Amino acid sequence: MDIEKIYKESGALLKGHFLLSSGKHSPNYLQSAKVLEDPKKAELLAKELAKQIQAAGIEVDTVCSPAIGGLLAGYELARALGVRFIFTERKDGKMTLRRGFEVEPGEKVLICEDIITTGGSAMEAAKEMEKRGAEVVAFAALANRGVCQRTGSEIPSKSECKLPSNKTLFALADFTFPIYEPKECPMCAEGSEPIKPGSRGN
């Protein structure tokens, strides 16, 4: 499956000058919502991701996603795996489990995002699950930015990766784009202003 082709055809592989949530700049941005707005594509990608997880013999009771980016990917993955889906969300800046969701002690939870960059939000969701007695068995995403190493990839984890090295990351593809500190950004040097994705219809 050519994941990059699917992202391009969906208009989800954006080019420009973007301000990332990390505060760094990049000439590229992945907008998974553009892929996931098509239920057939969402189902196809989730089934492909589920195959990886099942082939690895990972036992999953529940898929949990951090809101809001991971919701559609996580729901479709849970459907493909035949398990339930829950999500965490921020309240007063802290990732929490709300809306009556509960997890049982020892429940095997897989954390799913649409895209993993450093894995910060995914790790926050994982800690919330562990705090409630669940066992986080793995992490998954449709796309991986190449900061954290996914299973089957030769690209090693970088120091910025926040995911634990003893838990497997499943993803369909690596998307490695240039990322710059603002003071080292060549686009800024040319006088370009960065756009925060979502702020101007992106």
Curated annotation (Swiss-Prot):
Keywords: Glycosyltransferase, Magnesium, Pyrimidine biosynthesis, Transferase. It is an enzyme of class 2 (transferase). The keyword Transmembrane helix does not apply. 5-phospho-alpha-D-ribose 1-diphosphate binds at E113, D114, I115, I116, T117, T118, G119, G120, S121. Its cofactor is Mg(2+). One of its GO terms (biological process) is 'de novo' UMP biosynthetic process. Disulfide bonds: none annotated. Orotate binds at T117, R145. Pfam families: Pribosyltran. Homodimer. HAMAP family: PyrE. Belongs to the purine/pyrimidine phosphoribosyltransferase family. PyrE subfamily. Catalyzes the transfer of a ribosyl phosphate group from 5-phosphoribose 1-diphosphate to orotate, leading to the formation of orotidine monophosphate (OMP). This is Orotate phosphoribosyltransferase. It comes from Nitratiruptor sp. (strain SB155-2).
